[in-house]
Amino acid sequence: MTEGNFVDYVKIHVFSGKGGKGSAHLHREKYITKGGPDGGDGGRGGHVILKGSKNLWTLFHLKFKRHVKAEHGGNGSKQRSSGSQGSDEYIDVPLGTVIRDTETNEIIKEITEDGQEFIVAEGGMGGRGNWHFKSSTNQTPRYAQPGVDGQQIDVTLELKVLADVGLVGFPNAGKSTLLSVITAAKPKIANYEFTTLKPNLGIVEYRDFKTFVVADIPGIIEGAAEGKGLGHRFLRHIERNSTLLFLIPSDARDIKKQYDILLDELKRYNPELMDKDRLVAISKSDLLDEELKAEMAKELDKELQLPYIFISSVAQSGLTELKDKLWQMLNREPV
C-alpha cells in the first residue's frame, strides 16, 4: 500500500431510495362494469448500509465516491401487485471506522466487527394502494398514497486503526525499524522526519501461536495536539490502542523530558488516553556500555515511575523481554 492509498478520512453524501407510489387502479373485467379497487402497494426504497470488512485497511475506495445512492422502490400495479423493493446500496468500510453526521459532527456509529451492518439512510416506505381505502361509504376509492421520500445525509467517515499496541515517539525515533524486527511488517524506513505518513500495522507472533497487533503511529511533534506536524490526523488512531509503547532513543538529550512532552501531547488531545497502560522502550541501547546503562537505569528508576526496558532493533537485544512485557500488559498480568 502506497502512502497516497492510505485514506483515513472521507466525506460522502448518501441518498436512500424513495418509496414507490401506491396504485389507484380499479378492477376491470369483461361483464363486470363496477370492479372494486385493486391497486397494489409501492415498494420500499433501498437503504444505504455501511458494512464492516476485515479485508479493508483504508477508505481509499471511497476517495472519489462522493455520492452514494440507493434504488427507488417500484410502483404498485393492478391486481394488488406490490412494486419491487429498491435494491439496498452497501458501502464496505474497514474495521475501526467512525461515522459522523457532517453537519453536527455527532458520532452516529462505530463499525468494529467484520460483517457488522448499519443503515445510515433508510429507504422511504412505499405508498399504500387504493384497496386499503375502500369503505362502506366509498366502494371505489381513486386515491392511493405516494411513496415516502428517501433520506439524505452528509456523513464523514474516519478510520481509527484497530491495534492492541500503539507505538508512540518523535519522528525518527526508530519506530518503523522496531516494527519491522518484531513483526513481519515492512514499513518505509529512512533517516528523516515523517518517513511514516500512515499508520503501519504488524502482527507480533508470540509464544504458543499467540499474536497481538502493533501500530506504528506517525511521529508526534510538540504541538501535535494543536494540529502541528501531522497533528490530529494520526493522534486519533491512538484512541483504539489498549497499551501505549513510548519509544525514546538512548542518545536523547533528556529521556524524561521527551516522555513528558509526548504524554502531554496525548493528554491535551484526549485526557482519556491517560487511562491506557504505558511502557517506555529505550531504543539504540547497543550504543551504551553496561556501566552507562546501569547509571541511566538508576536515573530512570527515580524519574519515570513506570515500566521501562532497554532494547536495540539493530542488535535485536531486549526484544523477547519487550514482547513478554507487552503480552503481560495486554492480558492484565503483573509486569
Swiss-Prot record:
SUPFAM superfamilies: Obg GTP-binding protein N-terminal domain, P-loop containing nucleoside triphosphate hydrolases
EC number(s) reported in the record: 3.6.5.-
All residue ranges annotated as the Obg domain in the record: 4-162
Keywords annotated in UniProt: Cytoplasm, GTP-binding, Hydrolase, Magnesium, Metal-binding, Nucleotide-binding
Stated name of the protein: GTPase Obg
Role noted for this protein: An essential GTPase which binds GTP, GDP and possibly (p)ppGpp with moderate affinity, with high nucleotide exchange rates and a fairly low GTP hydrolysis rate. Plays a role in control of the cell cycle, stress response, ribosome biogenesis and in those bacteria that undergo differentiation, in morphogenesis control.
CDD domains named among the record's database cross-references: Obg (cd01898)
Gene3D superfamilies reported for this sequence: GTP1/OBG domain, P-loop containing nucleotide triphosphate hydrolases
Disulfide partners: none
Assembly description: Monomer.
A Pfam family per the record: GTP1_OBG
Single GO MF annotation: GTPase activity
Chain residue ranges for the region called Disordered: 70-90
Enzyme class: hydrolase
